[in-house]
Amino acid sequence: MKRDMGSYKMGLCCSDKLRMNRGAPPQDVVTAFVEYTEGRSHMTAEQLCRFLVEVQDETEVLVSDAEKIIERITCERHHITKFLRHTLNLDDFFSFLFSDDLNHPIDSKVHQDMASPLSHYFIYTSHNSYLTGNQINSECSDVPLIKALKRGVRALELDMWPNSTKDDILVLHGWAWTPPVELVKCLRSIKEHAFYASAYPVILTLEDHLTPDLQAKAAEMMKEIFMDMVYFPEAGGLKEFPSPEDLKYKIVISTKPPKGSLRKDKDSESDASGKASSDVSADDEKTEEETSEAKNEEDGFDQESSNLDFLTYSRLITIPSGNAKNGLKEALTIDNGGVRRLSLREQKFKKATEMYGTEVIKFTQKNLLRIYPKATRVNSSNYRPYNGWMYGAQMVAFNMQGYGRALWMMHGMFRGNGGCGYVKKPDFMMNNNLSGEVFNPKAKLPIKKTLKVKVYMGKGWDSGFQRTCFNTWSSPNFYTRVGITGVRGDKVMKKTKKEQKTWEPFWNEEFEFQLTVPELALLRIEVHDYNMPEKDDFSGQTCLPVSELRQGIRSVPLYDRKGERLVSVTLLMRFHFL
């Protein structure tokens, strides 16, 4: 039997004797305060600046920055509207360290090189971006598109189909029972929210089931709605993708070139080079009905009309899609004449990495590779994203309306680089080593770096959970799981002891992680309430890119199962690299 937090608080006077004391600073915090104040009761801006440089490794911080921190903390804690006191006491210092606004665990600004071609970046990518729930009969809507863009997703997918009278365009999941949404509504919402979270380009992946006249209509819609936001590539196709910096505030179209387009001679010399293919045809699981219908539509096209229509539509396509119809090896062949996108369902991608792992990585050094969930994931679950990232796949497409550890990893990866939706791939994935070999994620590699993680304490569950699944009669017994996900040799999970009967658990435990590929590693953090004999209650999670961790004592905010911020729920942790 479960009950909400309010009913739990009413039972605080019971014999359970719940410990509700406000957490005192850990000894490491006290020691640092004493050391940098030289034993005095207050810390000056100069002393705080020294602490930030020497302990927090913030080498570019100035005394003026420390003064702003002191002013902010003083105003918040003591309600001083005028900056009269220029120092922090121990409690103020502790409050600063526990502030995820002022002392966040990773850099909140874009800091990576954004001037390389798109193929050099992992791109925050959504699958069936318009679905509100499962893949069978959930409603199609522009709301999931808006949510994804606000979260920082940079690549969206729209499935375009003719309406029943063949004179307008709907967005829906084909061969299912999903109530459709009008394309025009989706495009307007994309325009309005495209750059809410990031200035870098939105890639619109179109799965095209339209006749030439409707393709032309779609092109006119996009030009009319997006106006100067839409990016027009150079005539004849690209030799190399533009950079995210080049494409700032632009919407980039990716789909199959229409049949008979000017790109045909160049891009369709073989199926591997971009012959008319949507994500559906990039998989040999196509149904006979689907293949037959596509052929009938093509055979029924009016050639005179389509010659005019494809000029309008194909002019918008920056990233032509390819397929694996003639086999994986041919699909992964590098075409020195241009660049393209290849889309593979997760099972076919797994097969590709098992048979042609080296070719996959070489392909992604120049081209884009998109992976999407298998058809049996009707509940909108997701696969492990590292399966794609380890082989350089830029567009690991996820069902953003789902939840679970795979989605937590996705959120974690793209908290990196200021949450802009583009994360630079490590140099070793883009360049061959001295022996001319590409990166092999299955190889046994030497330890490159050691990460020490100390979990001090947590707070906020008493106010952060409006309703909770904590056990009715037992007080919270929180513990934290800390681990690494990444290449096979780096994967590990550890956990703290259970902290008995308290809303503000204090663990003060340290863990050490030896990493062979820290550039691809994520730090996983989960908090649970021990609930024997039932299943332990989930109490918060986060994932953080190891390469982005800021050294020192940091405030780490936690999120719910769907990746939404748990208001006030925070851990105090310390990170140190050896």
Swiss-Prot record:
Q: Which InterPro entries match?
A: C2_dom (IPR000008), C2_domain_sf (IPR035892), EF-hand-dom_pair (IPR011992), PI-PLC_fam (IPR001192), PLC-like_Pdiesterase_TIM-brl (IPR017946), PLC_EF-hand-like (IPR015359), PLipase_C_PInositol-sp_X_dom (IPR000909), PLipase_C_Pinositol-sp_Y (IPR001711)
Classify the main location: cytoplasm
Report membrane topology: Peripheral membrane protein
Give the UniProt tissue specificity note: Expressed in leaves, roots, flowers and siliques. High levels of expression in the guard cells and vasculature of leaves and roots.
Spell out the subcellular localization from the entry: Cytoplasm, Cytosol; Cell membrane
Could you tell me the Gene Ontology terms of the biological process aspect for this record?
intracellular signal transduction; lipid catabolic process
The protein's Enzyme Commission number: 3.1.4.11
Question: MF terms per GO, please?
Answer: phosphatidylinositol-4,5-bisphosphate phospholipase C activity
Swiss-Prot/TrEMBL catalytic activity: a 1,2-diacyl-sn-glycero-3-phospho-(1D-myo-inositol-4,5-bisphosphate) + H2O = 1D-myo-inositol 1,4,5-trisphosphate + a 1,2-diacyl-sn-glycerol + H(+)
**Which residue numbers delimit the EF-hand-like domain?**
28-111
The Swiss-Prot or TrEMBL record lists the needed cofactor(s) as: Ca(2+)
Residues at the active site: 127, 173
Which top EC class applies here? hydrolase
Q: Where is the composition biased (Acidic residues)?
A: 281-291
- Reported induction: By environmental stresses such as dehydration, salinity and low temperature.
Q: Where is the PI-PLC Y-box domain?
A: 314-430
Q: Which residues form the PI-PLC X-box domain?
A: 112-256
The C2 domain, residue ranges: 430-560
Q: Which UniProt keywords apply?
A: Cell membrane, Cytoplasm, Hydrolase, Lipid degradation, Lipid metabolism, Membrane, Transducer
According to the lineage, what is the superkingdom? Eukaryota
Region of interest: Disordered: 258-303
Q: Which GO terms describe its cellular component?
A: cytosol; plasma membrane
SMART domains found in the cross-reference section: C2, PLCXc, PLCYc
- State the protein's purpose: The production of the second messenger molecules diacylglycerol (DAG) and inositol 1,4,5-trisphosphate (IP3) is mediated by activated phosphatidylinositol-specific phospholipase C enzymes.
Q: What is this protein called?
A: Phosphoinositide phospholipase C 5
Q: Which organism is it from?
A: Arabidopsis thaliana (Mouse-ear cress)
Gene for this chain? PLC5
